[in-house]
Amino acid sequence: MAKVPITLVMIIAIVSAAADLGCDYGHHRCYIDVTVENSPRQRHLLSDMDITLQCVRPMAKWFYEDKFQLRATLLRLERAQSGNSGNYGCLDSQNRWYNISLVVGHKEPVGNDIASFVKLEDAPALPESDLFFQPLNESRSLKLLQPLPKTVQRTAGGLFQLNCSPMDPDAKGVNISWLHNDTQILGGRGRIKLKRWSLTVGQLQPEDAGSYHCELCVEQDCQRSNPTQLEVISRKHTVPMLKPGYPRNTSIALGDNVSIECLLEDSALEPKITWLHKGNADNIDDLLQRLREQSQLPVDVTRLITRMDEPQVLRLGNVLMEDGGWYICIAENQVGRTVAASYVDLYSPSDTTTVRTTTTTTVASPIPTASTGEDNDDDVENPAAEASGGVGPPVFRKELKRLQHSLSGNTVNLACPVYGKANITWTKDKKPLNRELGVYVQKNWTLRFVEATSEDSGLYNCKVCNAWGCIQFDFSVQINDRTRSAPIIVVPQNQTVKVNGSLVMKCTVYSDLHPTVSWKRVVLKNASLDGLKSVEIQNLNFTVTNDSVVLTLRNVTFDQEGWYTCLASSGLGRSNSSVYLRVVSPLPPLEIYALLHAHPLGFTLAAITIVALFLLGSAFITFMLRRLRREKLLKLRIETVHQWTKKVIIYRPGGEEGSGCSSGDLQMPVIRIEKQRTTVSTTGTGGTDPAQGFNEYEFPLDSNWEIPRQQLSLGSILGEGAFGRVVMAEAEGLPRSPQLAETIVAVKMVKEEHTDTDMASLVREMEVMKMIGKHINIINLLGCCSQGGPLWVIVEYAPHGNLKDFLKQNRPGAPQRRSDSDGYLDDKPLISTQHLGEKELTKFAFQIARGMEYLASRRCIHRDLAARNVLVSDGYVMKIADFGLARDIQDTEYYRKNTNGRLPIKWMAPESLQEKKYDSQSDVWSYGVLLWEIMTYGDQPYPHILSAEELYSYLITGQRMEKPAKCSLNIYVVMRQCWHFESCARPTFAELVESFDGILQQASSNPNDAYLDLSMPMLETPPSSGDEDDGSDTETFRETSPLRYQYTYKFN
């Protein structure tokens, strides 16, 4: 026997009745066929027996206390205890009902349950074989109604539920706890919900996987369930998944309106929904299979039209007889298709109908070219709730129980709750309600009749209807006459009392006949349980009141600890129930209380002294704190002055920072600078000069890009413009760079004589570079310094300068020299002239096309693509610059460089010259001019054209620049395609990348040489664009009349 607390229960069986019960007490087995009509309906059995109940074949439904248990032919109770006592019933396939009442051993007092029948009084002897004991942990309160599943698979983002209901869910004092990987789960908020007996985990995540089990406890006695292993599967794209129960079959009266819903689970792929109508189909499964295989629609199938904003709902109005039949819903996405059908049955308004809620569903195999996903098997706690508030027939809120059993004199409630508003009609045995004894009470969805009698048994039907249809349900009500039984005993729980204290225990008895009630005590001698000689039964004195028998114990001693049993007997049988009394020692009095009683005056004076000292100390501390506060405020007024600073405010339209460009063109951030008053300390606690700590501008902090100013060491100036300059610097500890490694970067900043407009331009350029992102063929932003000093924008550094100068210095026959003061390289030759041939120039064009392809994919327009705005980095990697400086296009009708007020008209497309229209295709025109620059080693385009009007006249007549001398025909064909007058006829940058990829492969003797190694890591050291350069070699023209040529030429 396990070492657990046990309850001593003494029961003497009725051995004389064992012969006709089909029981073998020697082997502790009992076999009962509940279908035998002449067998008794109430059985009295011993505990610890294996009881088998049999119902007719095939499988029957078993019920315990009117609650469904399982579907089987046999119901087996292993080592049955008093907790298994109660009413059992089975319902066979012919709806025939059989029931039996079992009384097993002794049942612990719970509510008004019938206690065990015993023969304790008037027993001449107590045979040793009839004495046994019941452990506490055998209670039905700690047995699970159903075991937990061993393994469960769920999809990430789905729902996971477990239920640990005990066999007696109404038992009191039962506590439940849930554990995940042996760690207690604390729910109540977030994704984890704990109800009475259930655990629900929503929005599953990978860390939710593991072992789950529950633990039921009654006082100190606990029992743990078997573990359930949860596996969380990552969510992938799947075919459209229908919500359970959709679409629903329905019945509708002629002339009424009906809505059929094809509701789908949420999915990242937007499905396309199609509705078809098929009349009476002989084999609907064949039709669904053909549709699943994506074959052509049959001739006799009609395609229906639904609202574009609500394709999942098909609405039919004023239905006719030809509208009946099958309605097929096809939901399709890139993975596959799901096909489901529902049947619409039409009837005359005078007929009665029952709504059918079945669905025919089939899922197609995935489309061959799309990636397949896994089915979503997430649980849905209440699928019917999805239909609440919708258009359609009523839907029951919960599953209804057909069989209703009760005893005579009880109140019976029948309920048919539905969602929404509807009318309900009740009938009994297909007739209107009519009760001879008593009345029926109807309230909302409930039918109630009190003091039920056997005449109230019958078939009750509820019919609920609304404007779209009706549903109905049948209740089979069986009212049984109350069987007179042995007395029912209600006793208190186990008691605890202090030694020498008093205790009152009441034993309340309910009986059909006048009972005889008494209190007895069971005494164990020598703490032995091995025989009858160690047990003694003592009679106790008690008093009888109107409704109970009271046992009063005074001056309780330790010897009186033990079991006390209340016995009740009548002509119908005997019952008993026990309670355990525990006697404990009182707590010893504390010494402080003894001293208090001995010296009350001394304790009073000490308390008064402590309180007085506390009050005086509080007053002193309050006075000192107020004085220090006044002195601090006075000192602060002396040490502070007020100055005006400028706050930079950045508005990012089209999404959050870092989200890239929105749909359409790049939405430039709006920069506002507002003045505000700032308090500055004049003494500075750090010992620094206040003037050095004061900043003219206050910038918002962006922790993703902010770099400490101490990590930069500024060097020589690379270039200057009208309002800003670019400085070479050494940076330490940049993100994604080796520790303690120094990186050469370029730092952009405004000059001392700058204006607010100049500062806004630099901030706008920085924000645009943040939104565009990183690519190997564009100048990338590395970070910024915006706090504790002027604004520094840190970008990559390109040591070889811009492409235009690079081509000029490396053209055939050119002297190989460079300036020492430009901050780039010394006079060493950049690249051997014999290697800078057409193939290398084509590689340069290929890289620039890749960079422009990336900008176009980000919906960003360059507006000033030219060789002067392409920088040459380490390894002769081309990097596009100045894409962040097309800032004035949205503020004015054209782009004007702030340095010298000139326009790059020779690189502008015709639509940009005429209408100031800029898009990705106008950048393609500029790319063609850039390609011409590359193939001529940096020559100026259109050398003989001097004005915008002359250039537009030259282009509109169909004239284009001639093929360069050292340019192949394939590359010149690409130039001419970029110079197509109609923008829609020009190739895209993606197509240009493919063209140059093919040209490089054809030009290479080794196929592997045709590809550039562009998978190298991002350079951390390239520079900014050369927007602030003086542009001495840039052929641009001053804008003599900004609007004159806009109206001179018109498109046809």
Curated annotation (Swiss-Prot):
Q: Does the UniProt entry include the keyword Transferase?
A: yes
All copies of the Protein kinase domain together span 712-1000
Does the keyword section mention ATP-binding?
yes
Sites binding ATP sit at: L718, G719, E720, G721, A722, F723, G724, R725, V726, K748
Q: Active-site positions, per UniProt?
A: D864
GO cellular component term, pick one: receptor complex
Q: How does it sit in the membrane?
A: Single-pass type I membrane protein
Cross-referenced InterPro entries: Ig-like_dom, Ig-like_dom_sf, Ig-like_fold, Ig_I-set, Ig_sub, Ig_sub2, Immunoglobulin_dom, Kinase-like_dom_sf
Which residue ranges are assigned to the Cytoplasmic compartment in the record's topology? 627-1052
Q: Which SUPFAM superfamilies match?
A: Immunoglobulin (SSF48726), Protein kinase-like (PK-like) (SSF56112)
* Main location (coarse class): membrane
Where would you find the membrane-spanning parts of this chain? 601-626
Q: Where in the cell is it found?
A: Membrane
Q: Which GO terms describe its biological process?
A: border follicle cell migration; branch fusion, open tracheal system; branching involved in open tracheal system development; compound eye morphogenesis; epithelial cell migration, open tracheal system; epithelial cell type specification, open tracheal system; fibroblast growth factor receptor signaling pathway; filopodium assembly
**EC number of this enzyme:** 2.7.10.1
Glycan-carrying positions: 99, 137, 175, 181, 249, 257, 423, 444, 494, 500, 526, 541, 546, 555, 576
The record's disulfide annotation reads: C30-C90, C164-C217, C262-C329, C416-C462, C507-C566
Query: Where is the secretion signal located?
Result: 1-19
Q: Which residues does the entry place in the Extracellular compartment? A: 20-600
The residue ranges flagged as biased composition, category Low complexity, are 358-372
Give tissue specificity per the record. Answer: During embryogenesis, expression is seen in mesoderm, endodermal precursor cells, CNS midline cells and trachea and salivary duct ectodermal cells.
- Origin: domain of life: Eukaryota
Q: Which residues carry this modification: Phosphotyrosine?
A: Y895
Describe its function.
May be required for patterning of muscle precursor cells: generation of mesodermal and endodermal layers, invaginations of various types of cells, and CNS formation. Essential for the ability of the migrating tracheal and midline cells to recognize external guiding cues.
The Swiss-Prot or TrEMBL record describes its family as follows: Belongs to the protein kinase superfamily. Tyr protein kinase family. Fibroblast growth factor receptor subfamily.
State what protein this is by name.
Fibroblast growth factor receptor homolog 2
Q: Please give the organism.
A: Drosophila melanogaster (Fruit fly)
